[in-house]
Amino acid sequence: MPTELITYEQNFSSGVDAENDYPPLDSGMGSFQVSELERQGDSHKRSNDEISELRDETLNGREKKLRQSESISRNSTGNAQVEAIPHHSINVDQSDNLLSEQENPTKVYLYDDPHLENDPQQRQEESDANGIMEKLTDDNSMKQVSNAKTSLETAQFLETSNSMELQRTKPHDMNIISPSEPLEQPFYVNAKQYYRILKRRYARAKLEENLKISRERRPYLHESRHKHAMRRPRGQGGRFLTAAEMAEMKRKEEEGTDNDSFLQEHVPKMNVLPQQLPGPVKDNNNEKSDEKPVAKEASN
């Protein structure tokens, strides 16, 4: 089978390389290309949808603000009452302002469609609603500040009055001890007693949890032991005295009594006349002389 050789010659007349002078390949993307008219139509539809959404949002926000203002005016306890102004009740001055704004409007452009502008009437309604909300917030803030000031003043007055009363009652309270409150005295135990007390408390708490014994308990376990402890002599700090300490105390008491008897015996008595003693002095001689005639009369 004969083979044909294909050769390419350079065409220098056109000034373009022959290798690069091929027709464009069909990649299949031509059907997905969109014309400029279709793009403009899509952008215009998108801008219209966004404008409608913005208008709906502004209307909903205005209605919410008016409802909030009405609720705040109902809840306010002050004398000043704020009324919600409907958006269709506009004065003549406001209409004049709207005309002046239509003649010289402030240009507000959107991002997608810069030729569209906001509605001046809509902007006026938004400004009215914002002014009402600002007034309401100012009134509420003033009321809160006044309430806070009054509460602070009352608290300061109460604190000063309480401090003055405490200063007046302190010196009396320091000297007077209420009889209803008993004085807590410390008690001393050795190591064996200490561990025994802990063991007893643990067992009692366990029984109280199981509701086997009542939680109300006496300050002592056994009445006889309590009486015996109350009779025992105590030393410094409420500690019980030992037998040696008790014997020494008895010896000191006996020595004190011996010294008193020795002084009474050996110190001479003062010679004091009865006239120098206080009180009326009775004369025994006169009493005897009075008794004699009575005896004579009785004998006669």
Swiss-Prot record:
Keywords: Activator, DNA-binding, Nucleus, Transcription, Transcription regulation. One of its GO terms (molecular function) is DNA binding. Belongs to the NFYA/HAP2 subunit family. The lineage of its organism: Eukaryota, Fungi, Dikarya, Ascomycota, Saccharomycotina. Gene3D superfamilies: 6.10.250.2430. Binds to the upstream activation site (UAS) of the CYC1 gene and other genes involved in mitochondrial electron transport and activates their expression. Recognizes the sequence CCAAT. It is found in: Nucleus. GO terms for cellular component: CCAAT-binding factor complex. It comes from Kluyveromyces lactis (strain ATCC 8585 / CBS 2359 / DSM 70799 / NBRC 1267 / NRRL Y-1140 / WM37). Residues 69-80 have a biased composition (Polar residues). This is Transcriptional activator HAP2. A motif (Subunit association domain (SAD)) lies at residues 188-211. Residues 218-243 bind DNA. Its main location: nucleus. Pfam families: CBFB_NFYA.
